[in-house]
Amino acid sequence: MSSNGWLQIGLLLALVFLTIKPLGLYIACVFEGQRTFLSPILGPLERLLLRISGVDARREQGWLAYTLAMLAFNAAGFLALYGILRLQAYLPYNPQGFAGMTPDLAFNTAISFVTNTNWQAYSGEQSASHFSQMAGLAVQNFLSAATGIAIALAVTRAFARSAANTLGNFWVDMTRSTLYLLLPMSIVLALVFVWMGIPQTLDASVTATTLDGAQQTIALGPIASQEAIKQLGTNGGGFFNANAAHPFENPSAISDYFNILAMMSITMALIYAFGKMVGDLRQGWALIASVAVLLIAGIAAVYIAETAGNPIHLALGLDPSFGNMEGKEVRFGQAMSAAYTAITTGISNGGVNTMHGSLTPLGGLVPLFLIQLGEILPGGVGSGLYGLIVFCVLTVFVAGLMVGRTPEFLGKKIEAREMKFAMLAVLVLPFAILGFSAIAAVLPNALASLGNAGPHGLSEILYAYTSAAGNNGSAFAGLSANTAWYNTTLGISMALGRFAYAVPVLAIAGSLAAKTKGTASAGTFPTHTPLFVGLLVAIIIILGGLQYFPALALGPIAEHVGMLAGTLY
């Protein structure tokens, strides 16, 4: 731990905050139907696509129609991607001659990319053809991100409108998210990545001669284009098995900075756009502040834990100045490895430049806990915002109980119907995480996949289901997850974490949109003050995190105590 490391982290966060307002204003303009600098180019294309699809942009949908359209679209995307993965041996652009994926692996992978999880039970450079990567996985990187943005927009309109029966048009929101936001930013970022040395080619591989004269075959492919949307869409699935630790995905410290900035840009700007669209920028900044408090605390915790190192190694006389460098790339160092670890799990990206299974017990506890909080720091593109709004609803309800008034948020009364749906959404994650983890912890077939015994083995299981249900996608890689049990149950967990959460959220949006927007009075609890920020942070920790404490005590916490006693697993 050094002042230079803290300076790197501080500079990174400062750059992120500089992008929030301009990008947030642009997003608000796009989805409020205002003219932007891209409108002359993309406006005619948008109208053409909607006309071909038979979509009337002026015809809006109620919450149920919006929800059914979202579910139908994602079901079609799942079937299309499943078919591509199963049939890739017969499809073009397969220079490696890869066979089709097995049914359970194709099921897992298709759900993974449709739900924006990008959990990968396969090695990309050894299992997925160029066609599967480009026409299958990369396409879903765009569509899953656009789906999250669309749901977030529907929730935003619920607070912006008064006595309304509609939330917008799902097809229009999807089209605009892709055309005006994801595609332009991805094109620019992909070109930047190519300039930085990330390959973009249809060649299968290149043969290199090592220093000792041996021949080595290095996989290639359309990497830069996939890397761009992987980060901007908070997808996280890598072209290579090593993900952003691979030099062809993340060749330098500068590219590492761009990767982190890209993964944070849209999801943070959406919170600002929320404030702009509901007519209260103070609310947007309050939500950003609550996210920043927890995310910065997570970064600091990982950095401190990893630079402290392993006391068993220190007792053997190893140099303490390096800390725990196992599983880390020296071109990034401790500070940026810690920042990437906390941010990728707080954001629901799931890409890694550090192997999370090699973190110290407390260092590994932090990313696990950040996912369990609900992926709202600031979470995935779109999904983080609507997840954060659920916790805002819970927070004002608790505040209302304390002062004896009907809770309100942004002029909308929060009543029994909204609370029921909010609690239903909040209970989805612990049900999927703890339920499947408990079964896997006693099932012989599941236990056979463990790479480590003791508390770390339990942590591997817990992290896998946490990552799947939280739609994150990162892993403790000691778990061999490419089995029928894990492919199936993790796939179910991913679907629950995405759709069983989104449906109650859209139901809340429909209920709130129909209500008349009231004006604030002297007795209204203000939701843009430091008091609200503190209460929101407390509710997130209590309701989002403490329900997992018994499981964490048996996993990473027990492993940490054992490490202090001289035991490793």
From Swiss-Prot:
It comes from the Bacteria. One of its GO terms (cellular component) is plasma membrane. The keyword Transmembrane helix applies. It is a multi-pass membrane protein. The keyword Transmembrane helix applies. The gene is kdpA. It comes from Allorhizobium ampelinum (strain ATCC BAA-846 / DSM 112012 / S4). It is found in: Cell inner membrane. The system is composed of three essential subunits: KdpA, KdpB and KdpC. This is Potassium-transporting ATPase potassium-binding subunit. InterPro entries: KdpA. One of its GO terms (molecular function) is potassium ion binding. The chain crosses the membrane at residues 11-31, 64-84, 135-155, 179-199, 258-278, 285-305, 384-404, 423-443, 490-510, 531-551. Pfam families: KdpA. Part of the high-affinity ATP-driven potassium transport (or Kdp) system, which catalyzes the hydrolysis of ATP coupled with the electrogenic transport of potassium into the cytoplasm. This subunit binds the periplasmic potassium ions and delivers the ions to the membrane domain of KdpB through an intramembrane tunnel.
